[in-house]
Amino acid sequence: MIKVVLLDDEVHCTESLDIILKTLNIEVEVLAKFNDPELALKFIKQNQFDILFLDIEMPRMNGFELLSSLNQINFDVVFTTAYNQYAIKAFKFSAINYLLKPIDEIELIDCLEAWKAKTSKQMPNGQLEFLLQAIQNN
């Protein structure tokens, strides 16, 4: 199960992303949705999750400022924005992906599948069984 947090200052953006995530054939749990970066920051510091879907342009604190304020980042970031001029800066902040709004469902699926592949420790078919058998024989 992929555990995600959604942060966008526009309520309709967090709600629509939440709806899209629930309709996918991928096991995703939305742990929290925020429209206020300061409230989100408190949650982020106190909870563990896999991916933060983070808007860049927000009042009071933009997405880059939010990440800069964290001592450590133990989750992956997917930036969401209507402005493609931030793409290079997003990857400098170690984003795993960058999705333009409105978010395309196929791009979102590709993003989540790529994350699963990156974090998966699965071995090719047969290799795991071989290793288990070798361990049992010793």
Question: Model segments located where?
Answer:
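Extreme N-terminal starter segment of soluble prokaryotic enzymes
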Residues: M1-V4
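N-terminal amphipathic alpha-helix initiation
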Residues: L6-D9, C13, Q127
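A generic secondary-structure micro-motif detector
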Residues: L7, V30, D76-V77
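Two-component/phosphorelay signaling modules centered on CheY-like receiver
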Residues: E10-A32
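CheY-like receiver
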Residues: T23, P37-F43, F49-L132
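C-terminal output/effector regions of signal-responsive regulators
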Residues: Q133-N138
